[in-house]
């Protein structure tokens, strides 16, 4: 089970990877959303703010009203944010749940394929 410090480190790496990917930023330039994440094993929650395709904030706890809610265990979140696994496979197996509009779920799929193209 991962604690907040480990999650925060993984999120920092993921933020740098996403914000540094020009292709991804161009592709998502019209996408601004608030995402809530919930760790099902330890109750840790966090919020990610995306503005015009750039991750501009990540903070502990749920802040504001989400456009998308993602839930899984803390280790899966860490592995996902560090790029050690493709979240699409876990999503298809029901190990990651995503609540949001169909368009937003498809956007998350597209982000996954840009970040993890070999999957």
Protein language model annotation of sequence segments:
Residues 1-119:
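Feature captures hydrophobic
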């Amino acid at each position: 089970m991962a604690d907040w410090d480990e999650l925060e480190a993984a999120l920092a790496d993921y933020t740098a990877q996403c914000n540094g990917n020009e292709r991804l930023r161009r592709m998502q330039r019209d996408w601004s959303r608030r995402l809530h994440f919930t760790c099902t094993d330890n109750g840790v929650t966090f919020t990610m703010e995306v503005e015009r395709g750039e991750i501009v904030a990540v903070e502990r706890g749920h802040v504001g009203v989400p456009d998308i809610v993602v839930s899984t265990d803390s280790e899966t979140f860490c592995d996902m944010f560090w790029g050690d696994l493709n979240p699409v496979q876990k999503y298809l197996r029901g190990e990651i749940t995503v609540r949001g509009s169909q368009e937003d779920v498809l956007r998350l799929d597209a982000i996954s394929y840009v970040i993890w193209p070999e999957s």
